[in-house]
């Protein structure tokens, strides 16, 4: 008999839910949750499907995740078709197996087992699911959180099923994430002929000292939970493509991954002061993708660590490394937020896969977390 976690994961992987498409994944989950007494509230925005589901009342533990996946790349490089889930040598292959349809299956089956064992559980169990995490992430969790906050919805704990693990399930737990802010800088000059530089003003030449200082700056030293803030230049663009034209404008895009030692407003102030010191003629636009968040300690961290230790006998590392996740939006509700999911070695890659045994373990861990917090 096939494991219910693996069976559900396969059903979800079969759905080609390229972001922001859901391709029917949420309907599968909704039917399973409704069957065990959950109230389902669709919260769709634009081209994105979301739902908020809950059972019980009181102190609230939510499980959050996304049904959308990234593109497959060249399918001829896959050992088996990416939307035909295949088990080989104990590994479940398919796009989304690790990020994050395996986690979704583990959550649903954990909820079914938990409700069967604790039909009158004392707290509230909830699900916050979106199809817009991998792409723009503008009509997904952020909009759901805004709607829930507007009506003063309670959220005490949130477990995000992102693939947090490195070598074995549960070895890494994310108890926070760095903030992310991007600068789109345009430095203005005067276009001209390269043979007559005195009649032009080359913005690339003007910008170089400022960019050198930008790169050399140590923005902070981090703290006990976060590494030092990182600034990386991502894109540069200037010129017409001709070798005899001095460009009239120089575009530079750079990104900060910042710790709780900095704020987005402080970053903006320091960058503007640096550019002004170099007397540049510029325009600057900022895009804030997310604030840093941290759950340093608390009942959720304790429950997650205990669940991992119970099933693996390893003590997970609590880290804040990696990119952003939807946890950055959920933390705005004042909830304790922790990420626990499968091994992330193959996410977004050709031949994405996850250990079938790990998914079974993960589901038991999720159930154990439920039992500790709201049984």
UniProtKB/Swiss-Prot annotation:
Protein name: Succinyl-diaminopimelate desuccinylase
Cofactor: Zn(2+); Co(2+)
Subunit structure: Homodimer.
Top EC group: hydrolase
UniProt: Zn(2+) 1 binding residues: 66, 99, 162
Pathway info: Amino-acid biosynthesis; L-lysine biosynthesis via DAP pathway; LL-2,6-diaminopimelate from (S)-tetrahydrodipicolinate (succinylase route): step 3/3
InterPro entries the UniProt entry points to: ArgE/DapE_CS, Bact_exopeptidase_dim_dom, DapE_proteobac, Peptidase_M20, Peptidase_M20_dimer, Peptidase_M20A
Keyword annotations: Amino-acid biosynthesis, Cobalt, Diaminopimelate biosynthesis, Hydrolase, Lysine biosynthesis, Metal-binding, Zinc
Molecular function in Gene Ontology: acetylornithine deacetylase activity; cobalt ion binding; succinyl-diaminopimelate desuccinylase activity; zinc ion binding
Origin: domain of life: Bacteria
Organism of origin: Yersinia pseudotuberculosis serotype O:1b (strain IP 31758)
Family: Belongs to the peptidase M20A family. DapE subfamily.
